[in-house]
From Swiss-Prot:
Belongs to the RuvA family. It comes from the Bacteria. InterPro entries: DNA_helicase_Holl-junc_RuvA_I (IPR013849), Hlx-hairpin-Hlx_DNA-bd_motif (IPR003583), NA-bd_OB-fold (IPR012340), RuvA (IPR000085), RuvA_2-like (IPR010994), RuvA_C (IPR011114), RuvA_C_sf (IPR036267). This is Holliday junction branch migration complex subunit RuvA. Has three domains with a flexible linker between the domains II and III and assumes an 'L' shape. Domain III is highly mobile and contacts RuvB. The keyword DNA damage applies. The gene is ruvA. Residues 66-144 are annotated as: Domain II. The RuvA-RuvB-RuvC complex processes Holliday junction (HJ) DNA during genetic recombination and DNA repair, while the RuvA-RuvB complex plays an important role in the rescue of blocked DNA replication forks via replication fork reversal (RFR). RuvA specifically binds to HJ cruciform DNA, conferring on it an open structure. The RuvB hexamer acts as an ATP-dependent pump, pulling dsDNA into and through the RuvAB complex. HJ branch migration allows RuvC to scan DNA until it finds its consensus sequence, where it cleaves and resolves the cruciform DNA.
């Protein structure tokens, strides 16, 4: 079972990346949106904690920049009828702290914004996660060690806002990454304004 990978970033798409290990083997890892958007340039060294999903017809690897994100992912897939793809979609929208807050508030409406999760599924997921709150709390306490650039919630809110304005993810991710690198305390609204200015300057 593969649990940890270190190597060079070979290629990346909007859902996954390929890591070339020192032994010359390339592994494709499925990543969250926030992990994809903070990937360095091709050829850079990268490290991911890995969860392996082995089935008769597939061997899928899910990568996470820190240990705690992987543990939250494992907590999610322990919920009945919640597979790895949907769990990854949830973590693409919400970090450990956000998810803990959703469970505490029983916020069905907010969780239902995740593609593929309707109100009925959201209610079942939140109910199931109540029994697993200790894992979420532990991950929240240690989440400062997770090497994600900028604030994940603000980054994703800014990305969502620009998407609603008609911009594609590929068009604005690099702008937002640079913006949060330069001003990590910026909120989503401020990041959107700066991004729009940069986009207009590059036309």
């Amino acid at each position: 079972m593969i649990a940890y990978i270190h190597g060079k970033l070979l290629e990346a798409t909007d859902k996954s990346c390929i890591i070339l290990t020192p032994g010359g083997v390339g592994y494709e890892l499925f990543l969250t949106l926030s992990a994809i958007s903070t990937l360095p340039e091709s050829g850079s060294d990268v490290t991911f904690y890995v969860h392996s999903v082995i089935r008769e017809d597939a061997f899928d690897l899910y990568g996470f920049p820190c240990f705690d994100d992987r543990e939250v992912f494992r907590t999610l897939i322990s919920v009945d009828r919640l597979g790895p793809k949907k769990a990854l979609a949830i973590l693409s929208q919400f970090g450990p702290k956000d998810l803990q807050d959703l469970v505490f508030r029983e916020d069905v409406k907010t969780l239902s914004i995740v593609p593929g999760i309707g109100p009925k599924s959201a209610r079942q997921i939140l109910w199931s996660l109540k029994d697993k709150m200790e894992t979420l709390k532990s991950a929240t306490v240690r989440s400062g060690a997770c090497p994600v650039e900028g604030d994940r919630s603000e980054f994703l809110d800014a990305l969502s806002g620009l998407r609603n304005l008609g911009y594609g993810d590929d068009e604005v991710r690099d702008f937002l990454k640079d913006i949060f690198d330069e001003e990590p305390d910026l909120d989503a609204g401020g990041a959107i304004r700066v991004a729009l200015k940069k986009i207009s300057q590059n036309k």
